[in-house]
Amino acid sequence: MRRILYLEPVGGIAGDMFLAAGLDLGISPAELERALSGLRVPGWKLAVSRAVRHAISGTHLDVVLDAREAHPHRAYADIRRLIEEADTLPPRAKERALAVFRAIGEAEAKVHGVSIDDIHFHEVGAVDSIVDICGAAVVLELLGNPEVHAAPPPLGSGTIRVAHGAMPIPVPATLELLRDVPVRFEGVGELTTPTGAALLKVLAHIGHPPDFIVEKVGYGVGTKDFKDRPNVLRASLGRLEQASNEGLWVVEANLDDATPQLLGHLLERLLAVGALDAWVTPVVMKKSRPGHLLSALVEGGTREAIVDVVLRESTTLGVRYHRVERQALERDWVEVETPWGKVRVKRGLRQGAVLNAHPEFEDCRQVAEAAGVPVKQVMAAAVAALGPKD
């Protein structure tokens, strides 16, 4: 079963908000701390509390540092070694955390015009940021490794003072991390931090999630209190009702230059490949040109094979498909006796009652040819032999 985690950075995203949202979904703080205990960084603990922002209640998390711990400027190689040597981190969590730090390092290197090996992390190299990023990787592990999707994050505006001095918001590293993905330029102050941006870039697909059934909702509350929005990250965890290729689908394409011979061939091919039904509808297309709409009703497992036939063997440049639902009568076959021989009849039933009945045409044709009578006469006799509908 596919699991989905959908993140909505209503008031932005930071590393501590990601962890807090995971805890609000039900993750045990003690279990999270155990997984992070192998990090060889001194003087930290998790402080978990309830908080409210704009009438939304959620979990707030602080990484509380030992007062004696300085904030060293760690190099990328130092952080990589810390993560690799943490024997309590699950292997997949290590891979994710390393990927997030590498993304941050590459963004910082691009901004400063140096090699990643020459980068020394300042705020992101501090103990709390290391715990945030490794903790986010552990959160996904404890949630069962769901697919992560996220809404476009708001970036904020203004300026902020960091180790390098005053910087515009979003800071250069944040914007570099979120190149080529949808974002929102709105809000006042720093709504999305470099750590939050890196978590989204590496761990999530930014855009609309697939339709899914929401089972749990958690709110990670940040440290800020914005006037225009709650500083919360909403996390919805659930499951897909069905895989995207299940159920019934209609595959269709518009054709403006298909010959009758080609249309007939396409219908035969679609049915041969596994379409439940296939048909052609006359349509009027752009510039008032007559054309044809080629359609096929298919089960999800054969959808891609049907799409392949349409693209390979028709003249279309594209294919559409959409999910459909249907109600069908139960069906069975009975054999009836006519004055000229036996004929099969297909019946449609609902709750045991016969609603429709259709003699098998090929049976009727063969009997009619052998007896020298019209086919319609055999068909009428077959229906009469079936008796009244029950």
Curated annotation (Swiss-Prot):
A Pfam family the protein falls into: Ni_insertion
UniProt keyword terms in alphabetical order: Nickel
Lineage: Bacteria, Pseudomonadati, Myxococcota, Myxococcia, Myxococcales
Gene3D superfamilies: mk0293 like domain, Transcriptional regulatory protein pf0864 domain like
Protein name: Putative nickel insertion protein
UniProt key word Metal-binding: no
Annotated family: Belongs to the LarC family.
A molecular function GO annotation: lyase activity
The organism of origin for this protein: Myxococcus xanthus (strain DK1622)
NCBIfam families: nickel pincer cofactor biosynthesis protein LarC
Keyword Membrane tagged: no
